[in-house]
């Protein structure tokens, strides 16, 4: 499956590693960060399948639209950084044809 996960972040250092670890099976994870003042960006950049871009927050919808405009995959999984993604759920998503 050609799938990109998108996460919107702002000061999520306490959540981001858990979420990105759960998405390690994916080839592409895009993090759109709203200029966090904590270690969110540094943590996310430590994952080899993650691309981090920063964009000033103006509207939630515009953050998602910006992220989606960058994605070339057929499928997009949109998540907040504090979502807990189980291995079973991700496996089921990846089995969709």
Q: Where are these predicted regions, by residue range?
A:
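Acidic donor-binding/catalytic loop of UDP-sugar-dependent glycosyltransferases
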Residues: 39, 61, 79-96
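Cell-envelope/extracellular polymer assembly enzymes that use nucleotide-activated donors
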Residues: 2-4
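A conserved acidic beta->alpha catalytic loop
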Residues: 33-42
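Catalytic metal- and UDP-sugar-binding loop of GT-A-like glycosyltransferases, i.e.
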Residues: 32, 55, 79-81
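Short, well-formed alpha-helical segments that are part of the catalytic scaffolds
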Residues: 6-25
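Glycine-rich, basic loop-to-helix element that forms the pyrophosphate-binding segment
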Residues: 56-71
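Short aromatic/hydrophobic "clamp" motif used to bind/position activated sugar donors
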Residues: 76
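Short, conserved SAM-binding/catalytic segment
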Residues: 45-50
